[in-house]
Regions:
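Conserved structured core elements
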Residues: 6, 91, 109-116, 236-243, ...
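Aromatic- and acidic-residue-enriched segments that line the glycan-binding/catalytic groove
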Residues: 65-94, 135-211
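Short, acidic/polar
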Residues: 33-49, 231-251
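Active-site-proximal helices and loops of the catalytic beta/alpha 8
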Residues: 119, 152, 160, 165-180, ...
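Active-site beta-loop-alpha junctions enriched in small/polar residues
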Residues: 15, 62, 134-138, 262-264, ...
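N-terminal structural segment of carbohydrate-active enzymes
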Residues: 1-128, 136-137, 143-147, 157-159
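Short glycine/proline-rich turn/loop motifs
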Residues: 17-30, 94-102, 205-234, 238-239, ...
Length: 298
């Protein structure tokens, strides 16, 4: 995009932005502490941001992520609490890339519509929408129930008998159960994963520690972590699936993606995916969270 001008981004977490509980309870539930809602981000709020000089609003925590709150009555898969950090969970442990987090909806059954209305309000106030894109990892119990018809889920056709295959979406520690150093519960409450999948922070064994991202699973972009070999032809399944996710949200009116932990995903994917998205949405902007300065200009 040319002549974009100066961008001023305001990060806004709907869950926290409009919360009204004056005395929140430490480690409290949503029933105790409440949660802000997308509908509460009204034109008054948005106009005030615009008047401050803000050009883009980065809405954090929109995409459905692991949580200890039970929404199974709405057809949402319940997360095992032992692979959720905190009651609210992390907005970077995605459980369904094609859905909206129910905590921030007034009417859970209309959560996507409420997001679409938020996008419309934001645009009507002269602002752009930034959404998180988390390409490196997903929640351990990732399962998309809201994916469009014909879309194949991550890991759906993986060969779990192989540690690495370019056709797999995950890495599997074959013959080993997931055995982190943190408590995984007992009996019916126990979290069981076999074979163990590699953990999000490049932990390629079955025993991540409490400081690892043990609640997440690393995505496989066609790189064998043991020897660094790259298998990008034909295009890996993960590339196509993640690009489809970008296109889905761009079609919802998202103007920019704040891309999480960019350096943990092959540069080649970014060149390919950005070009694919811009074929249909040439004005979409990609913003990188990047900690490897060696690939800054890649």
């Amino acid at each position: 995009m040319n002549n974009i001008g100066k961008i001023i981004i305001y990060q806004l977490c709907p869950r926290l932005f409009t919360i009204t509980q004056p005395n929140p309870v430490f480690n409290g539930t949503i029933a105790q502490n409440g949660a802000g809602k997308m509908n509460q981000i009204d034109t008054r709020v948005l106009n005030s941001l615009r008047d401050m000089g803000v050009t883009h609003v980065w809405y954090t925590g929109i995409v459905q992520h692991a949580s200890k709150t039970d929404y199974s009555a709405y057809g949402i898969h319940k997360s095992n609490p032992h692979v959720v950090k905190g009651n609210a969970g992390s907005p970077y442990a995605i459980t369904d890339y094609y859905d909206v987090d129910p905590d921030i909806a007034v009417d859970v059954s209309q959560r996507m519509k409420e997001f679409e209305q938020l996008v419309q309000r934001t645009h009507a106030c002269g602002l752009k929408v930034v959404l998180d894109f988390v390409p490196n990892h997903v929640a351990r119990q990732y399962r998309s129930l809201a994916k469009p018809k014909g879309v194949e889920d991550l890991g759906q056709t993986d060969d779990k008998g192989m540690f690495f295959s370019p056709n797999n979406n995950f890495y599997y520690i074959t013959g080993k159960p997931f055995s982190p150093s943190v408590d995984m519960g007992e009996g019916d409450d126990k979290y069981v994963e076999y074979p163990a999948k590699a953990t999000g922070n490049d932990c390629f064994h079955e025993c991540p520690g409490g400081n690892d991202w043990f609640e997440t699973v690393k995505l496989n972009y066609g790189v064998d972590p043991w020897n660094g070999s790259k298998h990008f032809s034909p295009i890996p399944s993960t590339w196509t699936k993640m690009c489809d996710i970008l296109l889905f949200w761009a079609a919802k009116g998202v103007d920019a993606f704040r891309c999480d932990m960019v350096h943990m995903v092959p540069v080649e994917f970014w060149h390919w995916a950005i070009a694919k998205v811009k074929e249909q949405y040439p004005d979409v902007v990609f913003i990188a969270e990047l900690y490897d300065v060696g690939i800054y200009h890649s």
